[in-house]
């Protein structure tokens, strides 16, 4: 309530600032699913300001994926080499930053489109021109703190969340492989090399496997960094509880309550990955792509959409769908446009696809029916598709 009272004078400006910040963060870091740790906190503020869940979701997951679509520094594990790569390097472009201007164009236009879309929805709701079937169950998001904590301070929460965000950004951006910046690697080597009379301080007290900032995606494992993110969140949670003198029992109860809320999300994640396993092992998408014989923007885009829907995880999407599509390309002049196309398709499917992990989390956690979300978001998705097609066409013509 204290935080809400401070941002309430901003009104809709807070929504617009949230959209811009999430989009910029995703664009500059390439993070998408990793940012869900901040969604409940920000969305709760939006709900307490009096806006509905659709505004909260589109201002968070919508802006994150808009940022990904216009992501300037997006990288992922290449299943062929097990190293980090950009979309440009993946398709074969020698300059990994060749699409900086087109992506910035996508980013700015996408943010403007989302702000317009959300603002129009808010206006229509206020004027009672639209109505969506949404359960009024904000108690699922904001629970009364157990115990006598009336004098609890908000500044530790803000400071610690800011610290988590900074570490997350520094840890996830591949400084060495993407920018050839070795400062964090050398700092890590210096810290791990510290010793007292032959006793290695850092490796023996903390860990021998904790990687340097910017190298959290190590060993070609696309999920390895989630271990460090989980440990970081656990540490932050315990620190906040300690500073605010929250009782151990209350901390455990709140943690258990949070796990209980996430159980449906975990179940749906399991279902989504079951679809992935069946699709990936069957290999029918690769067969369809191979039978296409040649690259075609229309057909290849449809196959990319299908691959993103069925394979769920970006690592397997790249392995089973994007790689075969790129192998069909014989004209090197279209590499840059294809990189933008594939990145954009993955981002769009993540906003609207029923198997999108970030969407599954959001809709389940906030109890929003998928049909309601689809009814609300389809116009924005159509606008994004047209915007992506326009930018890709411009790159092809240039």
Model-derived segments and spans:
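Hydrophobic alpha-helical transmembrane segments of multi-pass integral membrane proteins
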Residues: 11-41, 266-282, 292-332, 347
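Hydrophobic alpha-helical transmembrane segments in multi-pass membrane proteins
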Residues: 14, 111, 160, 164, ...
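Core transmembrane alpha-helical segments of multi-pass membrane transporters/permeases
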Residues: 1, 213-283, 305, 309
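Transmembrane helix-loop junctions in multi-pass membrane proteins
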Residues: 25-34, 78, 170-181, 242-252, ...
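Membrane-interfacial loop-to-helix junctions in multi-pass transporters
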Residues: 6-17, 49-55, 153-155, 226-227, ...
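Long, contiguous bundles of hydrophobic transmembrane helices that form the permeation core
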Residues: 85-86, 94-222, 226-250, 365-372, ...
């Amino acid at each position: 309530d204290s935080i809400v009272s401070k941002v309430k004078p901003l009104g809709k400006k807070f929504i617009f600032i949230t959209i811009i910040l999430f989009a910029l963060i995703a664009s500059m870091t390439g993070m998408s699913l990793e940012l869900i740790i901040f969604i409940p906190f920000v969305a709760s503020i939006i709900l307490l300001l009096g806006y509905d869940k659709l505004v909260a979701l589109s201002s968070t997951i919508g802006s994150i994926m808009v940022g990904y679509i216009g992501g300037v520094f997006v990288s992922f594990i290449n299943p062929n080499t097990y190293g980090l790569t950009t979309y440009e390097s993946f398709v074969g472009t020698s300059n990994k930053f060749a699409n900086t201007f087109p992506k910035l164009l996508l980013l700015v236009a996408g943010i403007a489109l989302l702000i317009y879309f959300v603002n129009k929805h808010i206006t229509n709701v206020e004027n009672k021109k639209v109505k969506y079937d949404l359960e009024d169950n904000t108690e699922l998001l904001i629970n009364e703190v157990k115990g006598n904590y009336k004098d609890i301070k908000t500044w530790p929460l803000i400071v610690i969340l800011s610290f988590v965000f900074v570490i997350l950004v520094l840890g996830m951006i591949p400084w060495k492989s993407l920018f050839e910046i070795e400062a964090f690697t050398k700092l890590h080597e210096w810290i791990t090399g510290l010793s007292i009379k032959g006793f290695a301080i850092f490796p023996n007290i903390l860990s021998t496997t904790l990687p340097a900032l910017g190298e959290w995606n190590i060993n070609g494992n696309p999920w390895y960094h989630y271990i460090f993110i989980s440990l970081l969140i656990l540490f932050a949670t315990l620190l906040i509880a300690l500073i605010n003198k929250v009782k151990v029992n209350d901390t455990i109860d709140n943690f258990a309550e949070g796990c209980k809320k996430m159980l449906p999300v975990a179940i749906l994640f399991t279902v989504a990955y079951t679809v992935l396993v069946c699709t990936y092992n069957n290999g029918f998408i690769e067969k369809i792509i191979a039978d296409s014989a040649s690259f075609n923007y229309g057909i290849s885009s449809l196959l990319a959409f299908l691959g993103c829907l069925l394979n769920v995880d970006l690592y397997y999407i790249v392995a089973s769908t994007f790689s075969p599509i790129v192998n069909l390309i014989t004209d090197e002049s279209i590499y840059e446009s294809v990189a933008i196309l594939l990145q954009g398709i993955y981002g769009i499917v993540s906003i609207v696809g029923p198997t999108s992990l970030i969407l599954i989390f959001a809709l389940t956690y906030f109890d929003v029916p998928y049909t309601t979300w689809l009814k609300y978001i389809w116009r924005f998705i159509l606008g994004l598709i047209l915007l992506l097609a326009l930018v890709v066409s411009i790159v092809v013509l240039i």
